[in-house]
Amino acid sequence: MNSLEQAEDLKAFERRLTEYVSCLQPATGRWRMILIVVSVCTATGAWNWLIDPETQKVSFFTSLWNHPFFTISCITLIGLFFAGIHKRVVAPSIIAARCRTVLAEYNMSCDDTGKLILKPRPHVQ
């Protein structure tokens, strides 16, 4: 393979990688917003649950029954983590990290947007 073909292959790979990472960004943003909203709801519900004087007087399950906002938001947050939201909010970073691992063997790397970074060849003495 000559240098021109190699350069074209690298450009095509870079275009495809940046396209893939950029396609993940809107979904990642939505998952981050969902996680933020549910986390704030859970924190607000937890605060109301903790400052309620009845919480100390009744059983744990009765206390949860008396605070449905906290209970539902907490169950939703746990469900989101079981569904893998913690992976979805960092999906572009995971893809970039895996690409960096593979590209390191070829003295290359990439940034978080998928742009290739060519490293200088090591000089063998």
From Swiss-Prot:
Its main location: nucleus. It is found in: Nucleus membrane; Cytoplasm. It is a multi-pass membrane protein. It comes from the Eukaryota. The keyword Cytoplasm applies. One of its GO terms (molecular function) is protein phosphatase regulator activity. Belongs to the CNEP1R1 family. The keyword Transmembrane applies. This is Nuclear envelope phosphatase-regulatory subunit 1. GO terms for biological process: lipid metabolic process; positive regulation of triglyceride biosynthetic process. The chain crosses the membrane at residues 33-53, 65-85. May form with the serine/threonine protein phosphatase ctdnep1 an active complex dephosphorylating and activating lipins. Lipins are phosphatidate phosphatases that catalyze the conversion of phosphatidic acid to diacylglycerol and control the metabolism of fatty acids at different levels. May indirectly modulate the lipid composition of nuclear and/or endoplasmic reticulum membranes and be required for proper nuclear membrane morphology and/or dynamics. May also indirectly regulate the production of lipid droplets and triacylglycerol. One of its GO terms (cellular component) is nuclear membrane.
